[in-house]
Structures are given as C-alpha cells and as structure tokens.
C-alpha cells in the first residue's frame, strides 16, 4: 500500500496542471490550489524519505508487471531527497510568482507549464526505467521550451533558439544511447541493466554507449557544453531563472551520478577521469565568467556552471567520499541557487539595473538583503558551518584519495573566485556610489522578504543539520555504488535471471 504513494509526487502536480488550464480567470483558486498541491507533494515526499531511511527502498510496479518487464518507480535515498528538495523549492518559486502578479489571470498558462516541468523533473528522479527517464526528460524539456520562449524580446528568442537546439541534440543522443544499450543488453530496467553489464565486463560497445550517455547528460547538466546557459538564464524573469537554475542542470547531474555509479561503473578507468577533466574545464570556464561580467544576472548564471563543476568533480573521483560529497552538494545547491537568483532578481527589481555599480549602498537601507547575501556567499564558498561546507570537504577528501591534486587545486581556486565575484557585488550593496548618481530604489514587497527569509533559514538549517543530511546521502552513495546491495534491496527476484 505504501508503494502506491510513490506515484503521488508526480501525479498531484500533473492533475493540478490540467485543472489550472481551466481556471485561467480565477487567480485566487489557482493560487491556493497550486500552493496546496505542492505543499502536500513536499510533505508526502518527506514522509517517504523518512520511511526509506528507517526501513528500505520502495518500488512501485505499474499494472502489476514486475521488473524488468513493467514500468517501475524507485524511491531510494537519492531519488527521494531530490524529490523532496525539488518540491520544496518549486513551492517557493510559485509563491514568488503569485506574489509579484506574474500569474495574474493565469498568464500564458504559466503555472501549468511550471507544473508540467515539475512533473518531468520529479519523474526523472523517481523512474527506474531507462526509456521512461527519456520520457520524463522530454516532458521537462518541452515545458521548459515553452517557458523560455515566453517573452517578446529579440534577446530572449535568440537565447531560446540556442537552448532548444542544444537540448534537442542532447535528446537525440540520449535516444540513440537507449537504442544501442537495449540492443546490447536486452533490457531497460536500471537494476537489470547493471546486472547484465557486470556480466559482460569490459566491452568496447558498452564503452561507446557510455560515452554517448556522457555527452547527452553533459549537455543537460551544462558540463562543458554550457553555451546555452548564461544567455538563457540572463533573459528569464526572476521566477523562471530560479526554477531553471535550481532544477534543470541538477537533473542532468543526477542522471550522471545515477548512471556512472550504478550502471557503467565497470568503465571507471575511462569515464571517471574524463568526468574529472570535464569538471575541471567547467569550473575554469565558470570562474572566468563570474569575473568577466558586471551584469549580476550573468554572474549568477556562471555561478551555476561552477557548482556543476564541483558536483561532477566529486563524481569523477570515483571514491565513496567524493560521490557522497557530490550528492550532498547537489541537494544543497538546489536551495542555494534558488536563494541566489531570488536575491539577484530582487536587486534588479529594486534598482532597475543589472549592473552591480548601481546598487549604491542598497544593503544599508535594506539590511535583510545584506545579511541574506552574506549567508549565501558563505554557503556557496563552503565556509563552515554553512551548508556548502560538508559537501566540499567530502569532495576535497575524495580528490585527495584519488590523487587528483589538479582538480583539488582548481576547486579551491574557483571557490575563492566565486566568492570574490559575489563579495564584489556585496561591496557595492554597502559602499557603492555610481558617480554620485541617485538611484531611486523601489520598495521591497513583503512577500519577497518572507520567501528570502525562509530560504536563508533552510540554508542555515542544512549546515546545522548536516549529519542528518549526510546520513541520507551516505545511504544513497552506498546503495548506488554497490550493485549487489542495489539488486538485493530493489529487485531481488532478478537474481540469477538470464
């Protein structure tokens, strides 16, 4: 009976999205329906996560067809902590949108498309079937295509074209990889694939397939293939930029972690050094971007790229500590990047400018923004006891164990550069004076302060409750790095199957 609840985090937003299509002229009902739906989704996800931590992973086989023949959803520590975190930030993002009137009269059916994107994101985390992962990716991407093209500026349309083209190429590669892998192993269920690939051992065809998946997921995670991200994020409104920054690249990073710990772990000698190299390149590119621009929205976009480099560096170490740190940092970064884009969007709203020179001592007039920005900087920089610290320490440890001293050095340097770029903004927030010009600051709406306060509290709480979160991420790491344990807990009936 409990396993049936596993469908609800995806089903509830889907049903809500359909209902909202017919409520385009009733803002009040739409608001309460959405917020209620996502709040319930978050609570259910958290309850399932607590159960899994105390007992064992949950599986749901649709239509009574057991794996590997039927569609299977898996609720383990990794998938459920991602679903819980994603549901929580989606709730805040939509509350932000309703607060600023973006959803008034259900404009462009915006809430529905955000919910459809949420369905794809949550489904990607829960599915234990390769083809259904592709389906969830496509649901997510189709909704994101609509969201990124909502606007009338030429700049936004140009960014949308780049985003759409690169993601379509990534989807083609993903589908190609699925076809080749099915031809090779004859199954699409994750645990069954892992078992058959282990039986095959080292194989050139499998190596080629793993490289195809690596490129496909790298495009979605902005790992080296980042060209779409800065332009796309810079032209989106605050709500959508926060949504994309918090979730879109993280789904790609999640797929990389799931695939290259559980499925293709027998190709460690090739894939993991390649992942570490790509992570290093991504960190360097991100670091160059954050110091090259004065546009605070582009600085925020390149911060996303740096964080992806950190996460994949942990995966590339191929150590328990490094992978554990990557998962912890992945979860933390969803919340931190939501906070970053909310703050940046609010600064643009208040001043009317995207350049940090025009902040003109804003933090003196609005201390909350100064405090929130400082906490966010420390979380991004991994300063103890803030939320970024445990993940970075574990990634450092993994890099040391792996002997990847270059990656370790680059992570330290790029962390300092990331903090420097944000401290530069903070300086103008306290001491800025754009040639003595007067900047008329808009009054900050109360709902922005409330949402920022919630996110700041959560960021602090993650740092304080790090042992609790690490217990979850450690279980996730253990399950996904042990094929036998995964097989035993998820699909024990497949044991010994030809």
UniProtKB/Swiss-Prot annotation:
Record note on quaternary structure: May form a heterooligomeric complex that consists of seven subunits: mnhA2, mnhB2, mnhC2, mnhD2, mnhE2, mnhF2 and mnhG2.
Protein name: Putative antiporter subunit mnhD2
Superkingdom of source: Bacteria
GO cellular component, one term: plasma membrane
One Pfam family matching this protein: Proton_antipo_M
GO molecular function (one): antiporter activity
Membrane-topology descriptor: Multi-pass membrane protein
Family: Belongs to the CPA3 antiporters (TC 2.A.63) subunit D family.
Principal location listed in the UniProt entry: membrane
GO biological process: ATP synthesis coupled electron transport
Record field: transmembrane: 2-22, 32-52, 78-98, 108-128, 130-150, 161-181, 209-229, 240-260, 271-291, 308-328, 330-350, 369-389, 403-423, 451-471
Keywords on record: Antiport, Cell membrane, Ion transport, Membrane, Transmembrane, Transmembrane helix, Transport
Intracellular or extracellular location(s): Cell membrane
UniProt cross-references to PANTHER family, sorted A to Z: NA(+)_H(+) ANTIPORTER SUBUNIT D1, NADH DEHYDROGENASE
Gene behind this protein: mnhD2
InterPro entries for the chain: CPA3_Na-H_Antiporter_D (IPR050586), NADH_UbQ_OxRdtase (IPR003918), ND/Mrp_TM (IPR001750)
């Amino acid at each position: 009976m409990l396993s049936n609840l596993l469908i609800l985090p995806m089903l509830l937003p889907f049903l809500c999205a359909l209902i909202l299509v017919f409520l385009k002229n009733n803002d009040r009902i739409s608001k309460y329906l959405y917020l209620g739906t996502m709040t319930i989704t978050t609570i259910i996800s958290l309850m399932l996560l607590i159960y899994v931590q105390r007992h064992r992973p949950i599986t749901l086989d649709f239509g009574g067809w057991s794996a590997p023949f039927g569609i299977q959803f898996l609720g383990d520590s990794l998938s459920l902590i991602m679903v819980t975190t994603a549901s929580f930030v989606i709730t805040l993002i939509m509350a932000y949108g309703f607060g600023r009137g973006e959803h008034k009269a259900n404009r462009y059916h915006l809430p529905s498309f955000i919910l459809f994107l949420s369905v794809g994101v949550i489904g990607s985390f829960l599915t234990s079937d390769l083809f259904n992962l592709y389906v969830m990716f496509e649901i997510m991407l189709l909704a994101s295509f609509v969201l990124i093209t909502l606007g009338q500026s030429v700049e936004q349309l140009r960014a949308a074209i780049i985003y759409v083209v690169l993601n379509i190429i990534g989807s083609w590669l993903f589908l190609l990889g699925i076809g080749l892998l099915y031809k090779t192993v004859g199954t699409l269920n994750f645990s069954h694939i892992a078992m058959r690939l282990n039986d095959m051992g080292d194989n050139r065809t499998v190596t080629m397939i793993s490289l195809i998946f690596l490129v496909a997921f790298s495009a979605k995670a902005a790992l080296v293939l980042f060209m779409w991200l800065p332009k796309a994020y810079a032209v989106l409104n605050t709500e959508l930029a926060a949504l994309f920054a918090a979730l879109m690249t993280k789904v790609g990073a999640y797929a990389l972690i799931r695939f290259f710990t559980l499925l293709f772990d027998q190709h460690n000698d090739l894939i993991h050094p390649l992942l570490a190299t790509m992570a290093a390149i991504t960190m360097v590119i991100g670091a160059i971007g954050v110091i090259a621009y004065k546009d605070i929205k582009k600085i925020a976009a390149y911060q996303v790229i740096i964080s992806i480099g950190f996460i994949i560096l942990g995966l590339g170490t191929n150590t328990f500590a490094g992978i554990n740190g990557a998962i912890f940092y992945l979860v933390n970064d969803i919340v931190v990047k939501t906070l970053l884009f909310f703050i940046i969007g609010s600064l643009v709203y208040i001043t009317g400018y995207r350049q940090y020179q025009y902040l003109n001592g804003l933090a003196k007039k609005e201390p909350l923004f100064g405090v929130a920005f400082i906490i966010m900087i420390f979380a991004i920089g991994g300063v103890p006891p803030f939320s970024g610290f445990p993940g970075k320490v574990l990634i450092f440890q993994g890099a040391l164990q792996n002997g990847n001293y270059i990656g370790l050095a680059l992570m330290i340097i790029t962390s300092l550069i990331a903090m420097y770029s944000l401290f530069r903004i903070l300086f103008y927030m306290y001491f800025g004076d754009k040639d003595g010009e007067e900047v008329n600051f808009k009054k900050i709406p109360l709902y922005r302060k409330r949402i920022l306060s919630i996110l700041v509290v959560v960021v602090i709480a993650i740092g304080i409750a790090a042992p609790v979160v690490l217990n979850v991420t450690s279980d996730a790491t253990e399950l996904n790095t042990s094929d036998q344990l995964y097989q035993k807990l998820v699909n024990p009936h497949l044991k010994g199957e030809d």
